[in-house]
Amino acid sequence: MSLRFVIGRAGSGKSTLCLHEVQEELKQRPRGETILYLVPEQMTFQTQQALIGSEDVRGSIRAQVFSFSRLAWKVLQEVGGASRLHIDEAGVHMLLRKIVESRKDGLSVFQKAAEQNGFFEHLGSMIAEFKRYNVTPSNVYEMWQQLDAHSSSAEQKLLANKVYDLQLLYDDFERALIGKYLDSEDYLQLLVEKLPQSEYVKGAEVYIDGFHSFSPQELEIVRQLMICGARVTITLTIDEKTLAQPVNELDLFYETTLTYEKIKQVAREEKIEIEKTIPLMEQPRFHSPALAHLEMHYEARPNEKFHGEASVTIHTAANLRAEVEGVAREIRRLVAEENYRYRDIAVLLRNGESYYDVMRTLFTDYNIPHFIDEKRPMSHHPLVECIRSALEIISGNWRYDAVFRCVKTELLYPLDVRKETMREEMDEFENYCLAYGVQGKRWTSEDPWMYRRYRSLDDTNGMITDSEREMEEKINRLRDVVRTPVIRMQKRLKRAGTVMQMCEAVYLFLEELDVPKKLEALRIRAEENGDFLFATDHEQVWEEVMSLLDTFVEMLGEEKMSLSMFTDVMSTGLEALQFANIPPSLDQVLIANIDRSRLSNVKATFVIGVNEGVIPAAPMDEGMLSDEERDVLSAAGIELAPTTRQTLLEEQFVMYQMVTRATEKLYISCPLADEEGKTLLASSFIKKIKRMFPDVKDTFITNDVNDLSRLEQISYVATPEVTLSYVMQQLQTWKRYGFEGNLDFWWDVYNFYVTSDEWKQKSSRVLSSLFYRNRAQKLSTAVSRDLYGDKIKGSVSRMELFNRCAYAHFAQHGLSLRERDIFKLDAPDIGELFHAALKRIADRLLRENRTWADLSIKECEHLSAVVIEEIAPLLQRQILLSSNRHFYLKQKLQQIIFRTSIILREHAKSSGFVPVDLEVPFGMGGTGSLPPMEFSLPNGVKMEVVGRIDRVDKAEDENGTFLRIIDYKSSSKALDLTEVYYGLALQMLTYLDVVTSNAQTWMKKGGTASPAGVLYFHIHNPIVEVKGDASEAEIEKEILKKFKMKGLVLGDADVVRLMDNKLSTGSSDIISAGLKKDGSFSARSSIASEQEFNVLQKYVHHTFENIGKDITEGVIDIAPYKKGNKAACTFCNFKSVCQFDESLEDNQFRTLKDMKDSEAMEKIREEVGGE
């Protein structure tokens, strides 16, 4: 029994010496004693390859490469102890979830923390750390007693409570494992116990290579190997000079020096012979003098400079994507020009979450075979999502999001259906569920779902059309596709008495859905597309899910568990599942994390993402215990993993390892911006390398080839997929600035695309965008007639929409596009309710031959409640009755109608105008409808403007009959003559024209009526600010002012007094007008003469004719208006359709100049030739 150290700096040949010794021994004595070659998990594959890589050794039974966990499995297979069930990380998390849920009420710190994402991952890591450092539950309990007895500050009490919680959970976890299960850390503890019994290990030659430190648990294994084996050889990366000096925590080799001393101490304790250390002083790894210099003088202060040509390259990139593309181009150059194999190249990085997706895309585009050494979670795989969402459906009462997350996995689809068709149907089905607010018991009820197109509150026709019946049948068929398998599982879960029966319910759910066959189809399709890595995912995920169910049953099978806890535990297990990474080929670029990689035999290393805070890493205090808490535990004798401070001290060694992996070339790069454009800083580490290699230039990498010389641009011509974007870049330059001399070879590249049989069609789609103009071509007369017909019938709102943006009109009325209907109460629904409520009250008053003035406050309140109760079941598929929240909203809307009724009562008392008709249709056909506003357009097309007028009021005096329009609005609005001029506000003047043109409808003896005005009535329940001693009458007066109607009224003092009979001088509280003492109107009055009203009505006719002409002639310009801070695009539903983009020359707003009313009126006169 002996111990031997092989030490040396990085690249000194430690591993090579050990491998040569083993290979020589195998040649001399192929059937001798066992040779164990122990390496970290990440090194096992490459070490096995190196061991049998010589021509003299093609295979071996005597020598085996192991990791600690693999050796444990081997020994336990030999001597026993492996019969207990192994639980993996997912099983550990599930067991911990169950323990936490059962212990929740007794936990102090972790009761709420358990609901946070990642909690069980941290808890599992903490328990694993306890085990690796030989800390038992009793040790933790003793620590708690000690802390609890001496806790005085809040921080100390928090730590004591945290340690108490950890002790409870750790103890429960260990009790659950005893005699039945083994987790990964238990294997190592069992290995320590069983090694003395192993004949396989007894007398073995042991090599331990590639480690820099050992946990206490691993150190115990090393102890037993020294006792049982013939000789143990351990390699450590240490400079021999370091061993001759006192241990200094700032030394580069501090960590490995401590490891060296610990192992020697173990050897002394066990009286193991310590052989003479073998120091290796040469640098055989490095074929480059520069890399040898970097390794030898890495820690020197001040930095030792290397002059001359160096094989170290530094790049600064404009952004992350440019950096990765630069790496890809250089890899292709090394392979093409310097005869590198892809396996000779490695890319090292730390913040993989920022890089991996970009690297997958770009390396694929550059045709670079690559393998990313990272564990990918299974949580996004359709199978995992299907199980998780299906359980959420059941435990969460069939919520919309859970249902359609499950649907979109496509595993609920029948096996024999065409997926494309099913997707389209499910999209329609989802739209129905959104529109009808389907959730909860409606899914499980046997009552068939109804389908009716929602039209209006007045539509009480119960007849169902054929198309509605057909849609109804489809919806109920799709409902059964979705709900039937889930309901079956739901019933089984409710009947289940044990966890085993609940797991069986999940398994039967998957089996009845034919999930194995569906996953096989996905695997075949992935292989056909060349995605071999992802093809294996579908096999792995089924095996892992089955293993998870088996583990669940083995651990908790006979226990009873609530559905909610079962869902939580299952979800925790599913979240922990990960894909095993199996390299699909041997010749590929390895992409690995700096902290986990153990590279060897690479010629070129690319270290990317070398930014401040990343390399070296910024301090990160994460996990269950903070650094301060770890220090407290360490002072009390509990050794745990290194603190952040210790980790930072080890960072220099990590970076030293990072830059000494390559034998020939080292590339270091950093981006100056991330994918979102956020600024990043270069690391201080790059400055250090620059000081060591002052002759090395920092090369800037950009995506814009225009900034480069012709020779540099040639390197950007790579694969056809990649180069196409740069061709586009050059052609854009040509288009903007004309031909330049350095574009000539790009024309050759362009010619390749347009003449290549393979690329001609593909490139044409991309190259056509060069001449892309986001301009809507005018429709032909034939197409316009097909879309709109020979007779146009449209509302005033439609005409206004055309003037806001012709393309929006085309999208809505030509293509009939609309947003999907959502089961929610929007402003239009509320507006519709207000109109309907006020109409019902007014209709009742007309039937009873009463006016608003006749109502009492109590009657206003009663009628408001009655009409809201009548309307609520009719509005938006009974939305106001669908939930407590909507019921509360119904009460608020009732209060608004009540307040509005009171104001209408006050208005009626003060006014000579009375409502004579409500919701007056024109051009709608049927009894009671006024005729439409008709136009014969120059191209022969007939156009009718139709609509519905909220309220028509009439007043009479000795001067004649006057009619006015009242329009109810749920938001404040005034009539802007500038908007009238631009055709954006035509509604009120159109209504006034219609009623005055058909005045005989409301005249007892026939005759004509004059226009009295148009007013907007704002329906709301305002809040007013008053002094604390204000009387009730003063408060009511202030409220009345908030309801002042804005608009345009006839400039006749008598007519204005008819609207507000309390007005003598001053401003009216009812309308936007006021009188001076001399009887003239105040400056702020919104008035127009009768002649001006006539001009406005002529202008409205003129505008409609122009709109009709443009519609029928196919005008669909993408030309939205902009006036001040108002723009057509602000609330437009079709922005994603027109893709209006101000950065394009063709896409600019029609900027409308704001004008005073007098200026606008003058322009209107000019247009119609009015006086």
Curated annotation (Swiss-Prot):
It comes from the Bacteria. Residues 281-587 form the UvrD-like helicase C-terminal domain. Its cofactor is Mg(2+); [4Fe-4S] cluster. InterPro entries: ADDB_N, DNA_helicase_suAddB, DNA_helicase_UvrD-like_C, P-loop_NTPase, PDDEXK-like_dom_sf, PDDEXK_AddAB-type. One of its GO terms (molecular function) is helicase activity. Its EC number is 3.1.-.-. Gene3D superfamilies: 3.90.320.10, 6.10.140.1030, P-loop containing nucleotide triphosphate hydrolases (3.40.50.300). Binds 1 [4Fe-4S] cluster. Pfam families: ADDB_N, PDDEXK_1, UvrD_C. [4Fe-4S] cluster binds at residues 805, 1129, 1132, 1138. Heterodimer of AddA and AddB. One of its GO terms (biological process) is double-strand break repair via homologous recombination. Belongs to the helicase family. AddB/RexB type 1 subfamily. NCBIfam families: addB_Gpos. Despite having conserved helicase domains, this subunit does not have helicase activity. PANTHER family: RECBCD ENZYME SUBUNIT RECC (PTHR30591:SF1). This is ATP-dependent helicase/deoxyribonuclease subunit B. Residues 1-343 form the UvrD-like helicase ATP-binding domain. ATP binds at residues 8-15. Keywords: 4Fe-4S, ATP-binding, DNA damage, DNA repair, DNA-binding, Exonuclease, Helicase, Hydrolase, Iron, Iron-sulfur, Metal-binding, Nuclease, Nucleotide-binding. The gene is addB. The heterodimer acts as both an ATP-dependent DNA helicase and an ATP-dependent, dual-direction single-stranded exonuclease. Recognizes the chi site generating a DNA molecule suitable for the initiation of homologous recombination. The AddB subunit has 5' -> 3' nuclease activity but not helicase activity.
